[in-house]
Amino acid sequence: MGEEQSTVSGGGGPQESQTLASGTAGHPEPPRPQGDSARAPPLRAASAEPSGGGCGSDWGCADTSAPEPARSLGPPGWSKSRAPAQPAGLALTGPLNPQTLPLQLELEEEEEEAGDRKEGGDEQQEAPPGEELEPRTRVGAADGLVLDVLGQRRPSLAKRQVFCSVYCVESDLPEAPASEQLSPPASPPGAPPVLNPPSTRSSFPSPRLSLPTDSLSPDGGSIELEFYLAPEPFSMPSLLGAPPYSGLGGVGDPYVPLMVLMCRVCLEDKPIKPLPCCKKAVCEECLKVYLSAQVQLGQVEIKCPITECFEFLEETTVVYNLTHEDSIKYKYFLELGRIDSSTKPCPQCKHFTTFKKKGHIPTPSRSESKYKIQCPTCQFVWCFKCHSPWHEGVNCKEYKKGDKLLRHWASEIEHGQRNAQKCPKCKIHIQRTEGCDHMTCSQCNTNFCYRCGERYRQLRFFGDHTSNLSIFGCKYRYLPERPHLRRLVRGSVCAGKLFIAPLIMVLGLALGAIAVVIGLFVFPIYCLCKKQRKRSRTGMHW
């Protein structure tokens, strides 16, 4: 390291020459401003010898024959001759942690005050008339250094400025183009030049932010801090680009703005995204419950929960509002509905298998064995023809006869109802847990009666399945123990309606025609009579 000379002027007194060492290569000590433009209160070097009768220090004087050993101004190993000379009135302590800076300052002040009282006694410095004594203050910088500002006589109207730079370390920020780079702010007159350290992340300076810090100036002066902060962070939409669900809309689109609307299901005001099909308001909780119930029923094409809307919800909207387990079931039902008759899932693990027919003519012994399938995933052996576990030595027709046991169990009455009821269309057994007799098959959407197993039918003027005298009525609603009489009564009512209805219609038409003909003759006569009566009344009055 090279050495350089620094001269400190102390209010017109003799100049003192000190030797200093540059602290960091490539960052020399900035020169102090000279002349009238940089006038500052007279400062004295901490190591200046006392002149006259006093020691010339604000810390009190002890024995002048035994001067106080100078504190180390730098890291261990620095000598007094190698220590950098500081401006008069400023003492530089060792590097401190910025996070624990206030605590370290308080501890250091207490130690120094205790040492001063011990060595110098209770001597105090008095200020001459017309001047005030500046209290001893400290200003911390972000680079870990502390500036001790010693008390000094100065006019009360003097203004002191301390310029420091704070650098914020950036991480993972893209470099700005040359046209958008900001130039560093110009230093005010009388201030030392600001040396920016080399940056490894970004080559452009951060925008300038000047903040008033009057709390750092206890003497009424102003301390200006120039902060070089990082540029503003990038917004998430600009980094992410176009949203991945921008085409969904409605509840399935997380980028649609929320609006406080009343849910059509629970009738509560909530932040709701309108449905994409009918733009109606359904809250997320109600929609998730509805979709989960539909998936549990095996529905693939799920209708809109709004009764006025007859459209089906989009697949993306359904998947977005389902849980992980329900989403797996829904995707399985989708695949099951898209396949043809040559592809079936495994009864155990739901792995899809495609059956390829061979060109040879099957023999009676091999006609059934060709449908034997072994699942490559779970090694389960099953029959592709009847979609059941493999039945060795038994054909599919005989194996299906085993369903008689199931039908017998389903027809048994327990707790006042059947154990199960078979759908009249797809022939699957359905067990009711609660509710009325009107059932809807989850496989084929057929409406049937759980009590009798017949479809729900209705015809205007002839009644529906709940009518006692209708031919479409349930057999358990009218004379369940006398089926022949029930059929006779219902048949007679139906025949009577068939024959009486036309007669009533013809009679009604005839009466209507007669009324029209009579009206054509009676209405003009009535009008003439009424007019003649008015004339007769007016003649009698005159």
From Swiss-Prot:
Catalytic activity from the UniProt record: [E2 ubiquitin-conjugating enzyme]-S-ubiquitinyl-L-cysteine + [acceptor protein]-L-lysine = [E2 ubiquitin-conjugating enzyme]-L-cysteine + [acceptor protein]-N(6)-ubiquitinyl-L-lysine
Biased composition (Acidic residues): 122-132
Pathway: Protein modification; protein ubiquitination
Ranges where the record places region Disordered: 1-140, 176-216
UniProt topology in membrane: Single-pass membrane protein
Zinc finger (IBR-type): 328-396
EC number(s) given by UniProt: 2.3.2.31
Positions contributing to Zn(2+) 1 binding: C263, C266, C283, C286
PANTHER family assigned: RBR FAMILY RING FINGER AND IBR DOMAIN-CONTAINING
Family: Belongs to the RBR family. RNF217 subfamily.
Annotated protein name in UniProt: E3 ubiquitin-protein ligase RNF217
Lineage: Eukaryota, Metazoa, Chordata, Craniata, Vertebrata
